[in-house]
């Protein structure tokens, strides 16, 4: 698969999961709902291998595919996570350019069991009082500049994950109601790295469909294409400003944001540590 197609495929897969349009097929090209029996995954625009993520066709007509690729045939956790989102409809992907903080409860229809890792206290969960930075300018450079100049006055800000995702807010310049500042927790799935927002009052969980979500899938796609995951490859995926974006944020915020190492975004290894 050409390198320039990787962002398109990853984006299409995430969008299809968000709208419940991922379809699984067995080796005999029969539709199935069991990922353990699936050989192919289609999202309407592409058909990919359910194991190694190789893009097999730029369409969803599985019956015409003549695949002869080398494959590890090892289950892929990123695909499994997306399929669970799409088929079981347990978690709502929140992927609009600006997420309405107060609509998270409506969009997240999954009631997590008490034993779920997104509910039980652990080192991967940190409570965040969501506030906004001045993000009238949604460009990647402006997002980092405004975020880094926010002051770090003890208020925990969501790290800027990419230029195409703003902080949850009612209005770009209006702070949120802080009556219950700790009713949202940010964590990540330990298997897939997907970022999760959990509402401690409604017991609802939402997957944040940011560019970081796509980045995890892109990383697997890069690996399957045997592309060196270096600056050149990442630049092709995220645009020429990606490395500068994360470097600038990491350099400015490293000492003040020990709770979340922005520099880890470069390695696609997102993690959250407890705040003091």
From Swiss-Prot:
Q: Do the record's keywords include Acetylation?
A: no
The keyword Ligase is assigned to this record? no
The principal localisation class reads: virion
Q: What does this protein do?
A: Interacts with VP4 to form the outer icosahedral capsid with an incomplete T=13 symmetry, about 80 nm in diameter, and consisting of 200 VP4-VP7 trimers.
* Family recorded in the similarity comment: Belongs to the aquareoviridae outer capsid VP7 protein family.
| Subunit structure of this chain's protein | Interacts with VP4 and VP6.
Name recorded for this polypeptide: Outer capsid protein VP7
Which gene name does the record give? S10
């Amino acid at each position: 698969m050409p390198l320039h197609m990787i962002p398109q495929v990853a984006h299409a897969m995430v969008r299809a999961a968000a709208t419940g349009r991922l379809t699984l097929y067995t080796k005999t090209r029969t539709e199935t709902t069991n990922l353990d029996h699936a050989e192919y995954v289609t999202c309407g625009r592409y058909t990919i291998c359910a194991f190694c993520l190789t893009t097999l066709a730029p369409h969803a007509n599985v019956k015409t595919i003549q695949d002869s690729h080398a494959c590890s045939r090892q289950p892929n956790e990123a695909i499994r996570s997306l399929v669970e989102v799409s088929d079981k409809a347990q978690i709502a992907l929140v992927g609009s350019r600006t997420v309405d903080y107060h609509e998270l409860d409506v969009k997240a229809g999954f009631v997590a069991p008490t034993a779920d890792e997104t509910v039980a206290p652990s080192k991967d969960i940190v409570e965040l009082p969501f506030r906004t930075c001045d993000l009238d300018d949604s460009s990647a450079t402006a997002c980092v500049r405004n975020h880094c100049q926010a002051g770090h006055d003890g208020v925990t800000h969501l790290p800027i994950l990419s230029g195409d995702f703003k902080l949850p807010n009612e209005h770009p310049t209006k702070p949120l109601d802080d009556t219950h500042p700790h009713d949202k927790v940010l964590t990540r799935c330990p298997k897939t790295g997907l970022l999760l927002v959990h509402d401690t009052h409604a017991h609802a969980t939402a997957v944040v469909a940011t560019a970081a979500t796509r980045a995890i899938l892109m990383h697997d796609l890069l690996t399957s294409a045997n592309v060196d995951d270096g600056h050149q490859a990442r630049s092709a995926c995220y645009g020429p400003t990606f490395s500068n974006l994360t470097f600038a944020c990491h350099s400015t915020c490293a000492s003040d944001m020990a709770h979340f190492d922005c520099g880890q975004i470069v390695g696609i290894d997102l993690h959250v540590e407890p705040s003091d």
